[in-house]
Design a protein with these regions (language model features):
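A surface-exposed beta-strand-loop module
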Residues: 56-57, 61, 88-151
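Extended, low-hydrophobicity, Ser/Thr/Pro/Gly-biased non-transmembrane segments
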Residues: 127, 135-217
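Juxtacatalytic substrate-recognition/specificity segment
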Residues: 68, 219-343
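N-terminal, polar/Ser/Thr-rich
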Residues: 26-59
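Bacterial N-terminal signal peptides
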Residues: 10-21
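Post-HExxH zinc-binding segment in Zn-dependent metallohydrolases
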Residues: 293, 298, 323-324, 335-386, ...
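C-terminal recognition in membrane/secretory proteostasis and scaffolding
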Residues: 354-355, 364-616
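Zn2+-dependent metallopeptidase catalytic core
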Residues: 91, 95-101, 161, 168, ...
Length: 616
């Protein structure tokens, strides 16, 4: 994430209608340092095994223990590195910072000499040993889809955090993972089980680090979906009520089937939805993997439609990103940033298909689908104008101008426009589905990422040879407003817009183990004038606790649009509880309403039906 990666997709529940009033984000780091260029290449290694230990004792220390063993054929130094980021969470996270007590041993448990080459690389000298083991503890105290997090009875960890790789030796090596934990605890992962209990195999490093683990006490249930099993692993136990779980098991297999129709196949057998619900977490976030995804959510979202939309988004990533992705991201490079101009396709069009697959599966109706599209239109209209390609590139530095994740809604809307234009040009005989299916075959199936030439070539071919150079120049590389007055009637849709006034508090927060941490305060805002500072913990607004159910909607109702009204905040600053107050700031926002046009032409009605039902 990483988000508020929305993927990392993050939906900021506590900020849904108050942005930028309250914006909930996960911990982020500046993408400043990069690995020193010219790091020493490792000597070859083989027979790689990782052992992860998490039990009651390590849980008490909020850590896990990691051991990596491998064979060497010479005394040449072995250089081991830990990734700096997790694919899908487009930010540098410096996972090596949580390594504690690194050590190395050789044959006969003999201590070996080692040193550090840079911030995330260690050099080990075998000194005659044929098999080497390195080990360390790893701090697991960050509630983040791309990180490691523990409780007295539970652990989430990502392979990118804890599995070193031999520098410069490529990523095609196989590896085995063994989990050591309490006898009564469970393990959940998408990794292929080995022959021994709690042993798992990966054919290469990319697969190895794309399979997060749950270890401990959590619910684990399954149902048939596609050609395998859909498993839901949920922490804490009992966090998903029976009615919500039943709805998930009814809806998600249908969503998977609809998404599979787009690409012509379901590329995974079993799929594991891994979810953490935490009352101190004020958002919803998801991070995709090739046959699983990890959600972190406020308990208030469980059973709500917004959470199902996150599920649909992350599952669609199993095709779009985890398999079909831009050449800029093929293969993944784990030590530095990997910027691309294509996140509007990888994330934005994924978001479009999250909505499409839900309406096509009958999970939502057409009215709800149109509402979801209209919300994206409003979000884009209320944000600064930015080119899709520029927004995609900038995500690594988390712009503070309100565009850090704009490629999600704006990219989704670009997908809608392309879909409508293709259907209109082909008399509804082709669609964006054809583009996705063709790119999937031409890129992923041939072991490579797609290029801009391939993307626009596929779009043009689906539209019968129509040129999209002007579309690209104005709406992808450029910052022109989307031409809804000409696009929407082609699909039998009608748009209206209203200007509304909403309260703006001007504080950006992040949920952590201590509560709702203030990350940034906008100068001249309600919170800024009240004297709130980054590092404060926000406890309540006008006496209403931030942990209360329906906090955002109730806060909006309470504050109304009374510009200048006195607003009080209770915050914790260090050991002190302080009451702050400031005048309410109010801003204008555009609200959009999208409906089916009863006067649409027969062709437009066919196109609208094609969008909603996946038919031609």
């Amino acid at each position: 994430m990483h988000p508020p990666s929305i993927c990392t997709r993050v939906a900021c529940l506590a900020a849904a209608s108050l942005i930028p009033a309250i914006s909930l984000a996960q911990r982020t780091e500046p993408a400043g340092a990069t690995r020193a260029q010219g790091s020493e290449q490792s000597a070859p290694v083989s027979g790689i095994e990782y052992e992860v230990t998490f039990d009651s004792a390590s849980a008490a220390r909020r850590s896990l223990h990691v051991a990596m063993s491998f064979d060497v054929a010479s005394d040449a130094p072995v250089v081991l590195s830990i990734p700096a980021w997790t694919p899908g969470a487009y930010e540098i996270s410096y996972f090596a910072r949580d390594v504690i007590g690194f050590d190395a041993h050789g044959d006969g448990d003999r201590s070996l000499e080692w040193d550090k080459l840079d911030y995330d690389s260690w050099r080990v000298r075998p000194a005659g040993s044929k098999r080497v083991m390195v080990s360390f503890d790893y701090l697991a105290d960050t509630l983040d889809n791309a990180m490691s997090w523990s409780r007295p009875d539970f652990l989430l960890f990502n392979g990118t955090n804890v599995f070193p790789y031999p520098e410069g030796q490529g990523f095609d090596f196989p590896a085995t993972v063994r989990i050591h934990t309490e006898s009564g605890w469970r393990v959940a992962t998408g990794m292929t089980p080995g022959s021994a209990p709690r042993t798992y195999n990966a054919s290469n490093y990319h697969d190895l680090v794309d399979m997060p683990f749950f270890v401990g006490r959590f619910d684990l249930d399954s149902t048939r979906a596609g050609k395998g099993w859909l498993r839901i692993a949920a922490y804490p136990e009992g966090s998903i009520p029976p009615d919500a779980r039943a709805a998930d098991f009814q809806q998600l297999p249908s969503i998977i089937d609809e998404q599979g129709k787009v690409f012509g196949e379901i590329p995974f057998g079993d799929y594991t939805l891994m979810q953490i619900a935490d009352s101190g977490y004020g958002a919803i976030s998801g991070l995709e993997h090739q046959n699983s995804h990890v959600d972190v959510t406020t308990p208030l979202a469980i059973g709500q439609p917004i959470l199902t939309s996150i599920y649909a988004h992350e599952i669609f990533h199993a095709w779009n990103v985890k398999r079909m992705r831009p050449a800029d991201l093929w293969p993944y490079e784990y030590s530095n940033e990997q910027p691309t101009t294509w996140l509007w396709v990888s994330e934005g069009i994924t978001d479009y298909y999250a909505d499409l697959s839900r309406v096509r599966a009958g999970v939502i109706d057409s009215v709800a689908f149109f509402e979801a599209i209209a919300e994206k239109m409003a979000e884009v209209s209320n944000a600064p104008a930015v080119a899709l390609e520029d927004a995609s590139l900038s995500t690594w530095v988390h712009p503070e101008d309100g565009t850090s994740t704009i490629y999600y809604p704006k990219g989704a809307l670009a997908g809608l426009m392309l879909d409508v234009l293709i259907r209109d040009a082909s008399d509804n005989r082709a669609s964006l589905d054809d583009v996705m299916r063709r790119l999937y075959q031409e890129s992923y199936k041939k072991g490579r990422g797609f290029t801009g030439e391939q993307w626009w070539g596929a779009v043009s071919a689906a539209a019968g040879g129509k040129s999209f150079s002007d579309f690209y120049a104005r709406y992808v590389d450029g910052r022109d407003s989307y031409p809804w007055k000409t696009i929407l009637p082609l699909a039998g849709l009608k748009l209206t817009a209203d200007t509304i006034r909403i309260p703006v508090l001007g504080v950006t927060t992040v949920a952590d183990s201590g509560g709702l941490l203030v990350r940034a305060v906008a100068p001249g805002s309600t919170a800024g004038d009240a004297g709130m500072k980054p590092g404060d913990y926000l406890l309540s607004v006008n006496g209403m606790l931030v942990t209360e159910r329906r906090f955002v909607s109730r806060l909006r109702e309470m504050l109304g649009t009374r510009a200048g009204a006195r607003i009080t905040f209770d915050v914790q600053r260090g050991d002190q509880i302080m009451e702050l107050s400031g005048p309410l700031q109010v801003t204008e926002r555009i609200a959009m309403h999208l409906v089916a046009d009863p006067a649409a032409s027969p062709k437009a009605v066919r196109i609208r039906s094609g969008l909603l039902h996946g038919t031609r």
